[in-house]
Amino acid sequence: MIRKAFVMQVNPDAHEEYQRRHNPIWPELEAVLKSHGAHNYAIYLDKARNLLFAMVEIESEERWNAVASTEICQRWWKYMTDVMPANPDNSPVSSELQEVFYLP
């Protein structure tokens, strides 16, 4: 398994709405994530800094990257643009983090 972590932002007035939209996520999106090898996906909110920290275990980079081209992911990204900063393709603005420590 490959561990990935990344940081995104959420709009200051959208914390509750962001959480509402993720509890639960659309069943179709959950199915796509799982079918593309995503496991143990978690997102944490730092309310003071409007930051989202996400962590996911994936089976392969290729399968993980393929999620972005699915119709359901494209719809989800568009759905989320009013609660978080987005790139021109509607994907969330994010920065991948480098793992510096892991305790199995």
From Swiss-Prot:
GO molecular function: L-rhamnose mutarotase activity
EC number: 5.1.3.32
GO annotation, cellular component aspect: cytoplasm
Keyword Glycosyltransferase belongs to the record: no
Subcellular localization(s) per the UniProt record: Cytoplasm
Substrates-to-products reaction catalysed: alpha-L-rhamnose = beta-L-rhamnose
Pfam hit, one: rhaM
Residues holding substrate: Y18, Y41, W76, W77
Class of this enzyme: isomerase
Isomerase found in the keyword field: yes
Gene Ontology process terms (BP): rhamnose catabolic process
Alphabetic keyword roster: Carbohydrate metabolism, Cytoplasm, Isomerase, Rhamnose metabolism
Catalytic machinery residues: H22
Known pathway: Carbohydrate metabolism; L-rhamnose metabolism
Known partners and oligomeric status: Homodimer.
Family in the record: Belongs to the rhamnose mutarotase family.
The protein's role, per its UniProt record: Involved in the anomeric conversion of L-rhamnose.
Protein name: L-rhamnose mutarotase
Organism from which the protein derives: Shigella dysenteriae serotype 1 (strain Sd197)
